[in-house]
Structures are given as structure tokens and as C-alpha cells.
Design a protein with these regions (language model features):
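Residues lining hydrophobic/aromatic ligand-binding pockets adjacent to catalytic sites
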Residues: 1-176
């Protein structure tokens, strides 16, 4: 399965405005993965200076097909509103549950799958356990989870991902 990121032209230049033809071209590029059932979620990650524009969001979302999973990462806090969550939920599109040292998105589920981007510089053992509990709860509820750790400077992200994989495969410890 391949998770893809929407082209920067859509997220940082056009910012969903007048983007019909480029969106169509981008989606066409995903077609081989889609028809082979190897396409995972597609992430739209918007720049940190892009402020909320509900009219633009309302015009753009219908351009995206229902048979592909989409996640939206809004890095400007103005987007973190019930109005945005409702629009995403109405189309079964995920709010990317992103964490960084600069911004933490509320843990609002808007789709039948979870999409996590965990980009803090460090995660304690307790923090990683909490992440595993959240992911396990999604899986136990019949939802899929896509989880990505920061992977730039050292191997910790990959090690944490493997630790998470092992943790969710094992049953949770019994409570006393």
C-alpha cells in the first residue's frame, strides 16, 4: 500500500483555488495505484500561512472522488474549527492528527480511518504508550490507522514505528 502526498502546486500555490484541471491531472497520476488497489490515503498538507477559507474548501472537496481516502493537514490554527471538521466528516475525509513542537491538532475523528503525523522532536515512553492506545482503539473499532513518525535526522522515528506496530499487535495489559 502506498500513501501519497498531494502535489505542492495544489496545497501551496493554488491552495484549492481554480484547481480543477490540476486536481484532475494529479488524480490521474494516482490511477495505476488505485486500480491495483495499492493506493492508501492521500495527504493534503497546507502551508502554515494558509488561513481558513470555508468557501474555497466547500468548492474543492467535491472535486475529490469518494473511492479514495483523503486526509487534510491544516497547519494554521484558524482551520481547527467545528465547521471544518463537519465538512470533512460529511465526505469521510480525515483531519490529519498532526503533532509538532509548534502545533498540535485536536484529536477529532472525521473519517472511518485515522491519519497521524507525529513530528515532535521526542516522544516519551508514556507518550508512545498513549499513541499505541489511541491506535489500538481505532483498530478495535473497525477503523484503519495510518501513523507516520518524524524521520529526518535519526532512526528514532522508524524505531518508534516498529515499537508501535508491535504494541498494537499485542493485547493490552490487564488492568488490576
Amino acid at each position: 500500500m502506498f500513501a501519497c502526498k498531494a502535489h505542492q502546486n495544489l496545497t501551496h500555490i493554488l491552495k484549492m483555488k481554480d484547481a480543477e484541471s490540476f486536481t484532475e491531472l494529479f488524480l490521474k497520476s494516482l490511477e495505476p495505484l488505485r486500480v491495483s488497489r495499492r493506493l492508501g490515503p492521500v495527504l493534503f498538507q497546507f502551508g502554515p500561512t494558509f488561513k481558513i477559507d470555508l468557501e474555497r474548501l466547500d468548492a474543492y472537496l467535491p472535486l475529490l472522488p469518494n473511492d479514495i481516502r483523503f486526509a487534510f493537514e491544516f497547519r494554521h490554527a484558524s482551520w481547527l474549527t467545528d465547521a471544518v471538521y463537519e465538512r470533512l466528516a460529511a465526505r469521510n475525509m480525515a483531519l490529519c492528527l498532526a503533532e509538532s513542537d509548534k502545533l498540535e491538532v485536536p484529536k477529532v475523528m472525521t473519517a472511518n480511518f485515522g491519519y497521524f503525523r507525529l513530528r515532535k522532536g521526542d516522544y516519551s515512553e508514556e507518550g508512545r504508550r498513549e499513541i499505541a492506545d489511541r491506535v489500538r482503539a481505532l483498530l478495535d473499532g473497525g477503523r484503519d490507522a495510518y501513523v507516520y513518525f518524524k524521520h529526518e535526522d535519526d532512526p528514532r522515528g522508524a524505531l518508534w514505528a516498529e515499537e508501535l506496530r508491535q504494541a498494537v499487535l499485542q493485547p493490552p495489559p490487564m488492568q488490576p
